Amino acid sequence: KENGMIQIEQFRYGDNLAYLLYGKTAAMAIDGGAWQEILTFLKQHGLSLRFVTNTHRHYDHTPGDDHLLGKTKAAFLDCRTLADHEKILLDGEPVVVYRTPGHSKDSVCFHAGNDLITGDTLFNATIGNCFTGDLRGFFESIQRLMALPDDTRIFAGHDYVRDSLTFARHLEPDNPAIERFRQTCDPYFLYSTLAQEKKMNPYLRFNEEPIVRLLQKRKLPRATEWERWQSLMTIE
């Protein structure tokens, strides 16, 4: 699916989503658990796999790494050692790394053109669990992603859309953006735009009046952005 010079292909394995970024000749696998389908795609499109990497090192995102490395000449890029703002070149086009700790210490996002592969940091209509326990760091990572252009396409690490929209609707039953996304999203090529996320994802709506009223109704701290976001993270 083309979006600028670097194209993106999405693959499923369970509820996980794997990705291939590619130019005219070179490709990069991210969380490549669907390794057989990725190898088939590479062969069909005459692509050379140059890099294998991950959004983070949790086991469900890494099962394809050894298979892809063993069957190609690709280099492994360890997400734990990638630098913030590091540029990985595919046919001369940059894929930019953002370090986004929170879900895990080693979480990174990959930005190519308008496409952002977010792993378990930002999902479609929700965010990841904060397994590090560093809520402040996670909040700063989310704020950083929110500052990107509104037309940025969000490609997440899992398809949690149905449950995420159900929870978002539970918090904001009168929000039409939630149902609109449910009706229009493509389950075979799943993404949202950052503009859509800002309209439906409760964890990006901490400054919006309906969310502030919700926190007030539940008698939760809401004086600052940080307090509102912390309060949202406590709601189940």
Predicted features along the sequence, with ranges:
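Conserved beta-strand hairpin/beta-sheet module of binuclear metal-dependent hydrolase folds
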Residues: 4-45, 108-119
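An active-site-proximal "capping" alpha-helix that borders the catalytic cofactor pocket
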Residues: 131-157
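Active-site metal-binding loops of divalent metal-dependent hydrolases
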Residues: 32-34, 57, 102-104, 114-115, ...
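Active-site HxH/HxHxD metal-binding segment of metal-dependent hydrolases
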Residues: 14, 27, 34-98
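Core dinuclear metal-dependent hydrolase active-site scaffold
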Residues: 20-22, 85-112, 116, 147
